Amino acid sequence: MSKEKFERTKPHVNVGTIGHVDHGKTTLTAAITKIMSKAHGGEFKDYSDIDNAPEERERGITISTAHVEYESEARHYAHVDCPGHADYVKNMITGAAQMDGAIIVIAATDGPMAQTREHILLSKQVGVPYIIVYMNKADMVDDEELVELVELEIRELLDEYDFPGDDTPVIFGSALKALEDDTSDIGVPSIIKLVEALDTYIPTPKRDTDKLFLMPIEDVFSISGRGTVVTGRIEAGIVNVGDELEIVGIKDTQTTTCTGVEMFRKLLDSGEAGDNVGVLLRGTKREEVERGQVLAKPGSIKPHSKFEAEVYILSKDEGGRHTPFFNNYRPQFYFRTTDVTGACQLPDGVEMVMPGDNVKMQVELLSPIAMEDGLRFAIREGGRTVGAGVVSKVAD
């Protein structure tokens, strides 16, 4: 009997819970898995399963994250929940858990708090495109007016960070009651409503193969009689033999043509996202291309040397620096396949950055790199990772 192939018929979407400590993120995550597993199969994860999240290392940074999955009528969801505030900061900056949308959990008893604000700002900086609000602990508030005030406050807060406050779904309920199988409006029905909001408010993300072609160049060879071959893993899109392409980054942008795609020593007509390939380029000399550049669809990506970034600096325990750094700090920035030196400008009023901090900074690289908002990078000193960051805005 051959093994049954895993059939994924439903589109896949990545989400997560964010919000202030003790507002009920983990209880909500448990409630969703319980109610959805009853309706559509899957596994119920209780609070302690999720709360004792294993530590993972992403780019040398220790992050505790719980991964759960569940299905709705229309989709398959992968959902991340982090036990501690620091884990969220690291997770969002490194992109260890890239979210197509986030559920921000706010206790109706408290309203938005410091970390609520910080998580919304981080979501904006790292490019989380959609936020849905679950107003939790509804069983502990009797005052209708208070609830309306909290809702108004959260909508204004979303507006402040350029999320559409007026259009954002706000679901009112009690994750604890739902977990206890309470069937009143604030119990199980509030979870069903929340998942319906996920289904309708967060668009199905584009698959990598539907995006514009991009391949970071890892190596360059010259094959006598055939020309120059660049190798790498295709990050997005599809490349076909005959396509015109651009080589972007480090030097001036050049145009070239793909005359062959090779994988596992076989010649193909095309290569797609996820494939490790060699791409044969016509009219491009070996010395004109180098590791760190990208091969891309013409006009799809530009080289930049100045950008604004959100950065997490590793703590000493994570193997990072032992001392703070100051304005004009000049480490290497590792983008995709290569290191480029850059200078850091700290925000006004920030004198220094300590290991374990997260900070917004302006960076100017010595040579330009193909980049767009949302690109992740590592910060290194002599090959050792000391930080992680994400481009929040290209500048030049």
Curated annotation (Swiss-Prot):
Residues 60-64 are annotated as: G2. GTP binds at residues 19-26, 81-85, 136-139. Residues 10-206 form the tr-type G domain. One of its GO terms (molecular function) is GTP binding. It catalyses: GTP + H2O = GDP + phosphate + H(+). It is an enzyme of class 3 (hydrolase). Residues 19-26 are annotated as: G1. Residues 81-84 are annotated as: G3. Residues 174-176 are annotated as: G5. Keywords: Cytoplasm, Elongation factor, GTP-binding, Hydrolase, Magnesium, Metal-binding, Nucleotide-binding, Protein biosynthesis. It comes from the Bacteria. It is found in: Cytoplasm. InterPro entries: EF-Tu_GTP-bd, EF-Tu_GTPase, EFTu-like_2, EFTU_2, G_TR_CS, P-loop_NTPase, Small_GTP-bd, T_Tr_GTP-bd_dom. Residues 136-139 are annotated as: G4. Mg(2+) binds at T26. Belongs to the TRAFAC class translation factor GTPase superfamily. Classic translation factor GTPase family. EF-Tu/EF-1A subfamily. PANTHER family: ELONGATION FACTOR TU, MITOCHONDRIAL, ELONGATION FACTOR TU-RELATED. NCBIfam families: EF-Tu, PRK00049.1, PRK12735.1, PRK12736.1, small_GTP. Monomer. This is Elongation factor Tu 2. It comes from Ruthia magnifica subsp. Calyptogena magnifica.
